[in-house]
Amino acid sequence: MQFKPLLTASALALALGTGAPAFAQAPAANVAASTADAAPAELSTLVDQVDIPYEKFTLENGLDVIVHTDRKAPIVAVAVWYNVGSKDEPKGKSGFAHLFEHLMFNGSENAPEDYFQYLQEMGATDYNGTTNFDRTNYFQTVPTPALERALWLESDRMGYLLGAVTQEKLDNQRGVVQNEKRQGDNQPGGLVFYEIIKALFPAPHPYDHTPIGSMADLDSASMEDVRNWFRDKYGPNNATVVLAGDVSADEARPLVEKYFGPIARGPVNEPAQAEVTELTEDVRTVMRDQVAAVSIDKYWTAPGITDRELTALTVGAQILGGLSSSRLDNTLVRDEQLAVSVSAGNYAWQRVGILNVSATARPDVDEAEVERRLDELVAQFIAEGPTEDEVRRAATSTVAGTIRGLEQVGGFGGKAVTLASGEVLADDPSFYARQFEILATLTPGEVQAAMQRWMTRPSFTLVLEPGERDGSYEEAAGVAEAAGDGDPAEEVTVTKVRPAPPIDSVAELDFPEVQHTTLANGMALHYAQRDAIPATYVTLSFDAGSTADPADKRGLEGLALGLFEEGTTTMSSREIAETSERLGANISLGGGADRSSFTLSALSANLVPSLELLSDIVRNPAFAQSEIDRVRAQRITGVEQELRTPSAIAARTISPLIYGAESPYAGPDTGTVASLNAITREDITGFKDRWIRPDNGAVFVVSDRPLAEIEAALNGVLGDWQAPAVAKGTKSFDAAPAAPAESRIVLVNRPNSPQSYIYGGQLTSVDPRGETYVDFLNANNALGGNFLARLNMNLRETKGWSYGVRGAPLTNENAVAYTVRAPVQADRTGDALAELIRETGEFLDTRGVTEAELTRIVTAEIGELPGQFETSGAILGAMQTNAMYGRPDDYYERVADRYRAQTAESLDAAARAAIDPDRFVWVIVGDASVVEPQLEQLGLAVERVEMAGTE
């Protein structure tokens, strides 16, 4: 039940300079020349690897069914797409398509409970629903024996929903959606998307409103609207079912006909037609909000996804501002250093699209100069066009990303989504193949012609400046009304009894065999083979992480890691980016509190040159002072943005209160403005020498290539890498805070916030290596760990005060904290916190895990295992986790038996030994003028602090 705008201004993504792990020093191996000279695989060869064969059939009632067979795992993705979205909403009913999507999860006539309950019983993974302008989709990936149950469930809500929809459910989900809207609006830049849509698609254009809708229109939604929408829009002849995974068309057809065939055809739905608008003149708007830096965004309307020029526009946008080596990146960020970030993109929907270019100015630079240069560079690109090399690099990056994504059968972007989106939006499941055919032969002239046609028209410029928010925020009319206290629950009306089919035994997880060897320089190599896609994933993991930061140099690890790709002793940052794009490789740096990691995702056809590039980045970073200053400025802007973002404010505030200010886990891991400014080049090179070195790391690989080939390739680039003479770094976790005598509240005042962000936590004595750790995790699955857990069901599904609540252990190598997070509407902050305290206290005292909860949780955890490890990335992550905690390689195969042995009593004992309900620290980020009087009624000490501008 997720709505995500496809486009936001750059200010919404100011989490700049994300920390990246670093590699240690070695002799400057001469890898740059061979990498740059290596001939990558031909683009046509890569395109040929993107193939999703399918069979399609149509039932008599008009339901289209597409089946793709993929036997790599005993799972099937089930996707149901309806050809209706927010563009089809009548005037005065904005947001209704998305609100109706929520109601589809609240039970149908023969499955009247919350939909997620049935999904967990099946062991489903990757389940959700989304709404955009053009379509509404529902999806889940289930174990193969649960496929029939999933089809029964989806068909019941397609054909037999209305008898289960009540006024109480409508009112509740209205509140949930309005809190989803508040949650988005409450973010810095959260009102920008409304302004973009209003400017580019003025009423009465079908795209003149966002899918989330307006508060007033959501207030007006009625049961009659629900009935009409379902009858008019949700017939089988307006839907497509896609099955992708461990199933054939011959196996699927009888099941689909059995469950969907009897559903009557509905009215013929004619999706709204929409012309691509054109502004009569350039339009400019200035907005202010709690952002750290000025962003300048320019927007042009563009054609929809079926237009022949779509691919050319997308590639052009990548070259201009999407690639790491983009024109805007090279000039505005690297060379002239006028901007801390840039972007460009082509965001296409079914009927229309939006082209966007963006630059976020360095705080010390005149924004007018940034905009002037942005305009000049766009004009220059349109006039000159791209080079052949730029087009090939953009195309290769696109194809490589697609190959990696198609390892997954379902979820938000797997094979089922690819086939369904093509069918529903372009009337062709193979639409992706048509686009790739164009991509494989695309010329610079075609890209230039498309950009000249669409980007020389009048544009909309939106400048977002730091300051007090001046956009209009809309509140719901019934914000102060109680939810969940209305009339008694209405009875479900069953128009046709449809018994649920049984679920056969789910296959046990078959985790790949992990093999171990040692490279020539002594680094451990952990390897598993997966041949679902022609790709190789390599992680170099080092025992560092943000806990390696000195107390007075917080953010050092993140700043250092952010510099490894910004130039080596033989390659510039631009050359690194261009080489990576030619190879279709992706190198990411990160890790977390305890590890720093460098992860390469490579096309196996380009494995050796990709490894050469990775090795050069890890072993030979230049750490040029100019690059340090540039990346430091980016990271400082990121910190300043964190200090304006509710969730980040809460996290930065609570960490030292949980772990103790002296603990390495206290953070903030991104640092402060002062600590980042204090870091020198010597600090950065010292970090690399102490932590990013072969005697402090290990290599993890998942590949379709055999171990012998992988080992030889790694020895070729890492085998001669030796540790420097300086001593390895050490960490100390001796500092531990005294447990608080009682719970307390810290209120961070963030004026004019429509929501409050509640973040509670405490340090536990849980050992992640201990026998009771899994019991603790599943106890939390009853209390706060998933959608059906008590905290979420109370505040979201019963009260309607929040879009989502979660309780979760924050597990690090040397400390485990328990946390609760709940964004809630501002006027219910006190009530919501009181409910969180009550639910947690009762769970840890008189209302522990029930037998029904135990059965549901254990069934779900066992059933989900095959789906959890569908991808190479998931296998790679599990291998690293097992290594860090000293677990056996087959840990995830064994854990099912551990689940089966659990009892309600064992889960209760683990939770009660770990959590003390009377010793929570509760951080609340919200408008103190609204929130503080509510909190004073709870009987806890309240400390009020003002939101920091800088630290």
What do these predicted regions represent?
Residues M1-Q25:
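Gram-negative bacterial Sec-dependent N-terminal signal peptides
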Residues V176-G184, E275-D289, A395-L406, A602, ...:
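Short, conserved secondary-structure transition motifs
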Residues D156-V165, Y259-P267, D375-P386, I617-F623, ...:
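A common structural junction motif
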Residues I66-H68, A73-K91, G95-L99, E113-Y160, ...:
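M16 family metallopeptidases and their MPP-like homologs
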Residues Q167, R174, R227-Y259, P458-S459, ...:
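Non-catalytic, conformational "gating/processing" segments within enzyme and secreted inhibitor domains
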Residues D217-S222, V226, L676-I679, I684:
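Alpha-helical scaffold elements lining the catalytic groove of polysaccharide deacetylases
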